[in-house]
């Protein structure tokens, strides 16, 4: 099975975001309060009332991308990492989300981008049982011999955007963020999933 090169204009997606206001103020319902005497001291205090009041304020419900990355043709997991404990949980998560994963049918020479890690930041406190992580670094483009049996996650699938946000090393809400990809990450090391940027067709096994 061949995956043809994309012909459309390259798509860019965000990896960093800032929250944006809606512009004009809107009325937000908040719980009203009433003044009542403190049962212990007798002093006046505020207590929740059984009603709501509309308060004009700006609402922050949208996000704006502050840094973009081009969507690659897909992502490559080299054969030595296929079946390894290091990426087992990541592959499980991708499959649980319904993201299509294919297998290279033969050895191929491809242009890929590898991400070299320059900085790792972890949240000082756990959130939902995880130490949220962020990576900083740079991509370099190389020609690579991809072994048959390596895995390919194509970007020409309905869940491409989801795949991007989960896989990209600098994503602010991906597999790195939630420590799903954690083992082996260190400054000076290469992120284990590569971006495929080659214009040539890719040969994968038919399902």
Where do the language-model regions lie?
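Catalytic centers of hydrolytic enzymes
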Residues: 69, 79, 83-85, 91-96, ...
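Hard-cation-handling environments
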Residues: 1-112, 116
